[in-house]
């Protein structure tokens, strides 16, 4: 007996396939956006250095948990945007932001290429900052005067907040120290970062769940690369190429969003 689907069932099936295709596309765009933002970014470098110093597992979970919280916040903000602005305005504003970020990254790529900076140079700079913070912390704990001591920075405040005993009771001393430090540094460095703003923009335009899944997958991939081979690839990848790739990705997204706004 031949079973002929009714037009209604056929329409429903096609709608489901279209939804699935759209979701895969949104997730793929979110992943590529995060890779373009985070690969070689300061958060990537901090994660790689901390993993080299303390151990991979604790740093991975600390870094990724911070990124997960920041992503959740960005997605919620983006979800609220369509209720505040018309859809066309949201698309145009979001596309404009993507274009601005894209142009800025391409400009940075050109400057880095002309100055012959490498990703390894960025690792060295961030490593010095981390070492200086450790030295300052030890000096303050010993009660010694610090000539270059300034008012408490935002990172110091966050580090004190997340260094509470409840965290220390959950993990061993070494794991707790690495976990808390990775969480605090990544959390602060991601505030107002390109990836956070881009997540807000994409959440305002695309399906929130798709963006949430894609962004978290992207962050997970970048964090895994950072903790496993981050320091090793620092002298294998040219910084200007990373920035150029990110700039192109942002430019493409910006043009697509502005086009859809009209």
Swiss-Prot record:
Membrane-spanning segments: 31-51, 57-77, 83-103, 208-228, 242-262
GO biological process terms, semicolon-separated: calcium ion transmembrane transport; Golgi calcium ion homeostasis; Golgi calcium ion transmembrane transport; Golgi calcium ion transport; manganese ion transmembrane transport; proton transmembrane transport
Keyword annotations: Endoplasmic reticulum, Membrane, Transmembrane, Transmembrane helix
Protein family: Belongs to the GDT1 family.
Gene Ontology cellular-component annotations: endoplasmic reticulum membrane; Golgi apparatus
Subcellular location: Endoplasmic reticulum membrane
Any one GO molecular function term: manganese ion transmembrane transporter activity
Membrane topology note: Multi-pass membrane protein
Principal localisation: endoplasmic reticulum
Protein's name according to its UniProt entry: GDT1-like protein C186.05c
Keyword Membrane attached: yes
